[in-house]
Amino acid sequence: MSYNLTDPYEIARFIKESKKSTPVKVYVNGDLSNAEMNDVEWYGSNGFYILMGESDSITKIVLDNKHLIKHFRIENDRRNSAIPMLDLLEVDARIEPGAIIRDKVTIGKNAVIMMGAVINIGAEIGDGTMVDMNAVVGARGQLGKNVHLGAGAVVAGVLEPPSKEPCMIGDNALIGANSVILEGVKIGAGSVVAAGSVVTEDVPDNVVVAGSPAKIIKAVDDKTKDKTQILDDLRK
């Protein structure tokens, strides 16, 4: 079944209809040589095993063989999760450890996703764009090319409450640290949002905005460009 991930109601339907998953990894010190492990992925022999699969299946194996198990340890990082994480192996970008990126996200070439960044379903990250540490791109958020989304900044999602219009950040824009772009707001190409700002309405191209709510304080000039320069070396 296909879903239109540009529509918040379709995303909600996708989440509702998806098979919920509670994957676990279990380390077992014991004899599982005769255990039935058809529904799980497993490795090991001679008294030590690693099992990976759904919680219900692995719990059954452990309980059925508890008299043969000396010790076991369970690792689990989600419960009834509706959306898996994005498969990063085919992404032509730099993604640092600790970034949380859900499936159905598009990441452009030479983008940089830093530690602690969170990118939700339906988001689009353009070529050469950096999502800095602990920044959040909500559902369907769209970042253009060579954008810098500063540390701790938030591009609000439009899944709940549902909105037809996603946040859109234009090419070469810079969003300062800890700033917030509210639902449906569009930031023009080349514009700069000062750190800590709360942007509640659309911003035109090539201006600087600051404050809460953010207001235009000047046009982007050479001094602004020097202070907000994008470094290509960070995107190699």
From Swiss-Prot:
The alphabetized list of GO BP terms reads:
diaminopimelate biosynthetic process; lysine biosynthetic process via diaminopimelate
Pfam families, A to Z: DapH_N, Hexapep_2
Look up the EC number in the record and give it: 2.3.1.89
Q: Which InterPro entries match?
A: DapH (IPR019873), DapH_N (IPR013710), Hexapep (IPR001451), Hexapep_transf_CS (IPR018357), Trans_hexapeptide_repeat (IPR050179), Trimer_LpxA-like_sf (IPR011004)
Write out the pathway annotation from the protein's UniProt entry.
Amino-acid biosynthesis; L-lysine biosynthesis via DAP pathway; LL-2,6-diaminopimelate from (S)-tetrahydrodipicolinate (acetylase route): step 1/3
Whether Repeat counts among this entry's keywords is yes
Do you know which SUPFAM superfamilies this protein is assigned to? Trimeric LpxA-like enzymes (SSF51161)
**EC top class named in words:** transferase
Keywords on record: Acyltransferase, Amino-acid biosynthesis, Diaminopimelate biosynthesis, Lysine biosynthesis, Repeat, Transferase
Question: What superkingdom does the record give?
Answer: Bacteria
Q: Which GO terms describe its molecular function?
A: tetrahydrodipicolinate N-acetyltransferase activity
| UniProt catalytic activity | (S)-2,3,4,5-tetrahydrodipicolinate + acetyl-CoA + H2O = L-2-acetamido-6-oxoheptanedioate + CoA
Which NCBIfam families does the entry mention? DapD_Ac
Which PANTHER family does the record cross-reference, listed alphabetically? 2,3,4,5-TETRAHYDROPYRIDINE-2,6-DICARBOXYLATE N-ACETYLTRANSFERASE, ACETYLTRANSFERASE
**What family is it from?**
Belongs to the transferase hexapeptide repeat family. DapH subfamily.
Query: According to its UniProt entry, what is the function of this protein?
Result: Catalyzes the transfer of an acetyl group from acetyl-CoA to tetrahydrodipicolinate.
Under which name does UniProt file this protein? 2,3,4,5-tetrahydropyridine-2,6-dicarboxylate N-acetyltransferase
User: What gene is this protein a product of?
Assistant: dapH
